[in-house]
Amino acid sequence: MEMDQSLLSDAGRVRSDVHVARRAGTKKAGFAAAIRVIVIGMIALNVHWTFTLAIIAIFTMTLGNLGALVQRSVPRILAYSSIAQAGYIMIGLALAPYSDQALTGSLFHIMNHAVMKSAAFIAAAAVATALAGYSLERYRGLGRRMPITAIAFSISLLALAGVPPLNGFWSKLVLFGAGINTGETVWWGPYLAIAAVLNSALSLGYYAWIMRKMYMEEGSDMSRVKEPRSMIAVLVFAMVFKIGRAHV
């Protein structure tokens, strides 16, 4: 009876995660519209609080990445990762009054992040559906037990980390480049870019940790598991987008 209740609870959380993933694109579209309104308002009102926003961006990136490093649940890791990604997007807000490239980078990263994070949550939901759990321990040997899910999840994680040539690399490159290029206008632009690069490197720690579980460790049960077909179809589409987007 307790086992049945546990499985029902897990199934409920899986449905919640899929719902979150489906809504990610809509939320990112709203975020993009908000960015446009804020930037236009800042320029129109001649508000010079961009340095404060840059500090908040650094704090947000660092807080999200450090928080993710100490989690033991994959959805929690992804949630803290989203905080860090919001910090990267804020770089564009801080630099937008000085660089069109910065605003372009933010909007580009919002679009990429919607795909990357949705795919990551769907992969986590697929694992939870098949293995009835969210703990990192469930991911031991996943590369052999659920190979398609593991590959799609790995590509999502690498894209979130900004590893070339995936789509996350290119939007981060635009953002970080904006920081470097505004050095003659605002002294802190290059330092903001450096902080972002260091945080991207830090994020590799927990992304690689998950991938190590999937490919370099073995669980007590290494038998193949049936992968949810509906989720696999979405993951494959997202995987193609993340790779193909790098060449656009």
Regions found by a protein language model. Give the residues of each.
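Hydrophobic transmembrane alpha-helices and their helix-loop junctions in integral membrane proteins
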Residues: 1-173, 177-203
